[in-house]
From Swiss-Prot:
Name by which UniProt lists this protein: Acetyl-CoA decarbonylase/synthase complex subunit epsilon 1
Primary role: Part of a complex that catalyzes the reversible cleavage of acetyl-CoA, allowing growth on acetate as sole source of carbon and energy. The alpha-epsilon subcomponent functions as a carbon monoxide dehydrogenase. The precise role of the epsilon subunit is unclear; it may have a stabilizing role within the alpha(2)epsilon(2) component and/or be involved in electron transfer to FAD during a potential FAD-mediated CO oxidation.
Subunit structure comment from the entry: Heterotetramer of two alpha and two epsilon subunits. The ACDS complex is made up of alpha, epsilon, beta, gamma and delta subunits with a probable stoichiometry of (alpha(2)epsilon(2))(4)-beta(8)-(gamma(1)delta(1))(8).
GO biological process, one term: methanogenesis, from acetate
Protein family per UniProt: Belongs to the CdhB family.
Organism from which the protein derives: Methanosarcina thermophila
Pathway this chain belongs to: One-carbon metabolism; methanogenesis from acetate
GO molecular-function terms, A-Z: anaerobic carbon-monoxide dehydrogenase activity
Keyword Aminoacyl-tRNA synthetase: no
InterPro entries named in the record: CdhB, DHS-like_NAD/FAD-binding_dom
Source organism, top-level taxon: Archaea
Cleaved signal peptide residues: none
Length: 170
């Protein structure tokens, strides 16, 4: 008799997997625990009240920044490690475990996402969610269901308060 129940591996999962809603203290813990984090910012970060907070987050947690779209201009004189990359290319590269990263030191284990259009970043994160082991944490004001973890849908004022709390906890 052949035992067909041994050595089973799950190659596919069915159903919808969505991100876990988190608060700033959980986000701070996850960012602090990451071995190779990368802060990925969209063009929405150029608003002064967001840019100041993004710089503080990057400096406090010592995060390299992947500046997408036209966001690099906001970081040029801020004394942070920011490099330009197209967000779709970044999503593709993150699925390759052999990718050397933006600094040549290897792929990243955690990405922190801020200030993208919801419909846009969800498509990019769909690939990383399904084809890599990279964790993604969205700290934007909109709930991003394809991230591993995300802030919920919050108002702009609540978002500023959440980012300030995150900065204090890092």
């Amino acid at each position: 008799m052949v035992d067909t129940t041994k050595n089973t591996k799950l190659f596919t999962s069915y159903g919808v997997t969505t991100s876990k809603a988190i608060n700033p203290d959980m986000a701070a813990k996850m960012i602090s625990k990451a071995k190779r984090p990368l802060f990925v910012v969209g063009t929405g970060v150029l608003r002064p009240e967001i840019l100041d907070r993004a710089v503080k987050i990057a400096k406090k947690a010592n995060l390299p920044i992947a500046a997408t779209g036209s966001s690099l201009n906001g970081f040029l004189d801020k004394d942070v490690d920011a490099k330009y990359i197209n967000v779709h290319q970044l999503g593709f590269y993150l699925t390759d475990p052999a990718w050397p990263g933006l600094d040549g030191k290897g792929n990243y284990d955690t990405i922190i996402i801020l200030e993208f259009k919801k419909y846009y970043i969800n498509q990019v994160l769909s690939g990383t969610k399904n084809f890599s082991k990279v964790k993604s944490i969205s700290i934007g004001k909109d709930y991003i269901q394809n991230a591993t973890m995300s802030f919920g849908n919050i108002s702009r004022e609540e978002h500023f308060a959440a980012l300030d709390e995150l900065i204090d906890l890092l």
